[in-house]
Every structure is written in structure tokens, then in C-alpha cells.
Amino acid sequence: MWSRAIFQRFRFRAFSISHVIHGKCYRSFSVTVEFQNREVLICNHLLSRRIDEAREVFNQVPSPHVSLYTKMITGYTRSNRLVDALNLFDEMPVRDVVSWNSMISGCVECGDMNTAVKLFDEMPERSVVSWTAMVNGCFRSGKVDQAERLFYQMPVKDTAAWNSMVHGYLQFGKVDDALKLFKQMPGKNVISWTTMICGLDQNERSGEALDLFKNMLRCCIKSTSRPFTCVITACANAPAFHMGIQVHGLIIKLGFLYEEYVSASLITFYANCKRIGDSRKVFDEKVHEQVAVWTALLSGYSLNKKHEDALSIFSGMLRNSILPNQSTFASGLNSCSALGTLDWGKEMHGVAVKLGLETDAFVGNSLVVMYSDSGNVNDAVSVFIKIFKKSIVSWNSIIVGCAQHGRGKWAFVIFGQMIRLNKEPDEITFTGLLSACSHCGFLEKGRKLFYYMSSGINHIDRKIQHYTCMVDILGRCGKLKEAEELIERMVVKPNEMVWLALLSACRMHSDVDRGEKAAAAIFNLDSKSSAAYVLLSNIYASAGRWSNVSKLRVKMKKNGIMKKPGSSWVVIRGKKHEFFSGDQPHCSRIYEKLEFLREKLKELGYAPDYRSALHDVEDEQKEEMLWYHSERLAIAFGLINTVEGSAVTVMKNLRVCEDCHTVIKLISGVVGREIVLRDPIRFHHFKNGTCSCGDYW
């Protein structure tokens, strides 16, 4: 317009007027450029979540148009500042359907469904986006029936509306309704297919998810990378290894291999199929800078019990400046727990603190478990206290950790705090508390708790694990008849673990007859239970019935049943050192250390407890067999290779025997160091000649 006017003035040589028009044109152009610059600046601030800076620039705009108001409202709701968004919405001089939709969607995102309904009712004109936002809001509020009503009231439905309804059904486990609706959809896009495939897999119908993917390919739907992440996960869950390989080939063909979540899904797929080497090959295809890919490989190593490799991946992430996320810490700390390596765990804890994740429930829970499993329950409690929003998993983790370490009183104090804060306990909470009663000999407290859990305010149906704990409590306290009667009265069918708890108590209290009955019940459930054979053999050996021991060993050999070999390990400077019972010392220094300790212990009056050597041989042979139990080898190695005065932490795969328990108590006094031993039952903290279990384990 301005250029035409200037041309006309030049044509008639009206130079002065053309100068005026040029000035007006320049000022108008300057205002437009300034407005555009401010709009770009506002968008940049909103993108970086600098909402207050965006508002400052917004306030400098003379007459913001509707779209700029809408952008600010969206920015507020994405930052969970709903009140500010509503105030700005009220200030708008003019509103269009987009601004109404943005405000309604913001209320839904912020969880204020009442305000969303109020705005929806006040809308002068509704679009399909308005209806879809309300359907999503109903699903977010758990109002499935209301979502259905709104969906069927919609005057016009687009593909996004259908997709929202299908996704909502799948979210609430209404898979058949979702499938029915999916088939009725007039026009399915790739999002529709992806939603249905992922939903089927997440609802444990992975086979159907794979069939649907095949249909999608037959329909020649132009795919994005998103469906492939779901399909690969479904292949792992189905399991469908060969189809997974075919999908891998298709991913390469379509050029999706190097996309972050596709690579991560492939790594996870091969790891779940126990092909961790193939996971590594996928990872090594290129240099990855995405945390999801690194985390997938770390988790894969952890899943396949290659914990040292998992920790090596964590180190690699830090070297390559890849910042770990919550999932990374969960998998990495799980590997620390499995190895019992406190040094690695503390290093990860330090990284979590630097990233501000120590108080995050997901990371905090993993830290609590790691410290508990690594023998440091005090630090576990410290971490638990710092968790900002404690979930039921947080409470259960610390209660179970206290139980493992024989801190029964602590467990019940924490349970009391949990009840006072109106946190509802679940079945795992009661399993942890009953376990604490078992380890600490709290017979009456265990009885009351067992009764309370099924009849108190927080009613919990007793599960098999609760009965197992209660049988263990009674058995350890010598109430074998009562334990047997409890099994007979169980409302659920007793499994092998319940009978093993009774059989273990029979071994502890040398009750041969009841032990034979418990073993017979186990053999009816599992004729090849090596644990039952070993416990029954121990009962016979303690009673001096060597002929019965021989018969059992012949039967085990005939049926191909192998006794689990005893092993213990220590982790020093990030490396696991494992020892097996009966090993000759790995080096002369271990042999010398063991002999030195044997002489010192004999000076203190130590005499071997031959009942722990369950073989019909001479006493000298029994002493040698006992002296080279795996935990003693591991302790000697730890004493040699750690700093004088520091604690030695040893992990063992079998329950510690009575003689080893006595020996380790004495060693802790001789060397003046704390020795922490974790067996499958609990933790033992040996210090100054005593054990934290009080000789009750």
C-alpha cells in the first residue's frame, strides 16, 4: 500500500508529500519489526521455561493480539501456574476458540477438572479440540464413563478424538473396548496404529500387538520410528526372538536404527532375550550421546547379572559427559546392591547429589536399597529422611532394610511414623515387619501383627509370604507344633517356601520326625528340591544318623540333584573376588593369614563345632573342611587387601554355619575391625567379638 502511494507522488513530482509517506512507512515497519522481535523473544523464554522473563516482555507489547495471549497462557499451564494463566485469560479483551481450548487443556494438564468443565460450559463456540480436551481430562480424573458420554456426544470426531478415546480405554485396561473402537475408526493414521500396538503390549497382550503390527504393514501405513519401539518391546515380552530379528532388519532398511528410542529398545530387546553381546553390537554401531541408549545397555548388563560391566558403562557415561537420569541410577544402584560394593554406591550417590536427584523418590529409594544391601543401614536411614515425597516404596524399602540388619525396633518406629502420616501400608510393608520379628525374636509382636494385618483398620489379605514369615517366627522360637498347625490352617495352599521354613526350624531344633514330614511335603511339590535334601541331610547328620545321610546322597546323585556350592565374595576397588568352599587358598598370603588367625583363635580357647561339618569323617578332616569355608577365605583376602582399621564386607550365597559365626566373632576381636557378612537370610555385623544378631539367627 505504502509503496503504491509513494510511486504516485513521484509520478506527479510531489516530493514533500512522498517524504511524509516514506516516514510513516518507516515508522510502521519499525513497529512491526519491534513487535515481531518481542514475540520471538517471548517464544524463546517460554521454550526455556523462563516464564517470568516472558511476562516482562509481554507487558511491554502495547496491544498483544489473541495468539500472543494464548502462547502466554500455554506457557503458564506448562509450568503448572494455573492461577496466573486464569488471571491472564480473564484479562483478554477478545478470545477465540483457540484461546478457550488452550485454557481448558491447561486446566486438564494441571489437574483442575472442575474449572475445565466450567470453562467448557461457558464456551460460546466449541470445536472438536474442545471436546477432545474434555475427554482426555475425564480419563486423567479416572472418570471413564463420563469420557464415553462426552465422546459419543461429540457432533464431529476427527482422528485425534478417536485416538484419545482408544488411548484412554487402554490406559484403564479396557482392551476389548479399545479394539472394538479401533476397528470402527473411519480413518486410522500412524498414531492410531501405534497407540493400539503399544497399548496391547502394555496390557500383557504382546502377541496381539505383533499381529496388529503385521496388519499395519499389510495396510501400507507410512510408519514413523515410534511404532518400532513398541514392537521391539512386544517381541521381548511375547517372547518372539526371530520376529524381533526381522523387525531389526526392517528398522535398518527404513533408516530408523540411529534414532534414540529405537536403539534403546533394540538394546533392551536383546538383553531381555539373554543376548547381551548383541545388545553391545547395537550400542557400538555409532557414538551415542543420548542418555536413553546408555541407560538401556547399563540396564541390560544389570539384568543379565553382569554387574561389573554395568558399572563400567556408568563410568563411561560420566567420561562422555552423558548425564544419568533416574532410570540410570536405579539400574546402576541395583548392580551395586548385587555386588555389595559400597564404594561404587557412594560414588553414584555423589553424582546424584550434584545433579539434585538425591531427594527424588525414584533415586532415593534405590539409594536406600543399595545402602541396606551393602551393609550400611545407617546411611540408608539418612537417605530415606531426605526423600522429598516418600512413596509406599520408600517406606517399604527402609522397613525391609532395617529387618535385614536385625534392627526390628527401628522398623516398628518407622512403621509408627508411616501410620501417623496416614500412609496406608501394603502387603510388602507387613512382610518386612514380620521379617523383622523373625530376625529379632519378637514372638508376641509377630503374633499380634499377623492378626492385626487381616483384622485391623488397614485390612490386608494374608499372602503366602506372610504365612512363611509367621512359620519362621514360630519355628525360630521353638514353637514347632504351633508352626505346623498354622500351616494346616492356611487359607491358601502352602508352597515349598512355607514348608522349607518349617524344615529349617526342625534342623535348628533337631526335630527329626517333624522334619521328615516337612521334607515329604516339599518332595510332593518338587521332587528335585536340593534345599530340602540338604536340610534333611543336615538334620540326620546332627542326630548322628549317617546311614540316612548316605541314602539321601545316593538318591540325590541318582536323580541328578546337585547341592548348591557355597561361595563368598568381596569387592575391592571395584573388582569382585569370589571364593568357593573347599578352595585351596589362592595365594600364600591368604594361607598365612588363615593360619595366623587359627593360632590366635586357639589361644582364646576356640574349639571347632563339628556339628557344622556334615560328613562322617575324622575330627581332623572336619576341622580342615570347616576352616576353608568360603567366607573365611574371603575375610582373609579382605583383611590383607584393605586399609587397617576399615570394615570388611563379605557376601555369601548360603546361610552362615554356626562354626563360621563363632569364628568370625572371634576374628573381629583379634584384628580390631568390623566384619559385615551378608547371607541370604540377613546381615551380621561382627565387632569386638560380638555379632549384631545376638547369636539369634
Swiss-Prot record:
Where are the annotated segments for Type E motif? 498-573
Where is this protein found? Mitochondrion
What is an annotated GO biological process for this record, any one?
RNA modification
Please give the residue ranges the record annotates as the region Type DYW motif. Answer: 603-697
Question: Does the UniProt entry include the keyword Mitochondrion?
Answer: yes
Which InterPro entries does the protein's record reference? DYW_dom (IPR032867), E_motif (IPR046848), Pentatricopeptide_rpt (IPR002885), PPR_At4g14850-like_plant (IPR046960), TPR-like_helical_dom_sf (IPR011990)
Question: Can you list the GO cellular component terms from the UniProt entry?
Answer: mitochondrion
Alphabetical list of Gene3D superfamilies matching this protein: Tetratricopeptide repeat domain
Q: What is this protein called?
A: Pentatricopeptide repeat-containing protein At5g46460, mitochondrial
Q: Mind listing the UniProt keywords for this protein, alphabetically?
A: Mitochondrion, Repeat, Transit peptide
PANTHER family listed in its UniProt record: PENTATRICOPEPTIDE REPEAT-CONTAINING PROTEIN, TETRATRICOPEPTIDE-LIKE HELICAL DOMAIN, DYW DOMAIN PROTEIN-RELATED
In terms of domain of life, where is this protein from? Answer: Eukaryota
| GO MF entry, a single one | zinc ion binding
What is stated as this protein's family in its record?
Belongs to the PPR family. PCMP-H subfamily.
Q: Which organism is it from?
A: Arabidopsis thaliana
| Region named Type E(+) motif | 574-602
Note the segments forming the PPR repeats: 39-64, 65-95, 96-130, 131-157, 158-192, 193-223, 224-258, 259-289, 290-324, 325-359, 360-390, 391-425, 426-456, 463-497
Q: Where is the transit peptide?
A: 1-36
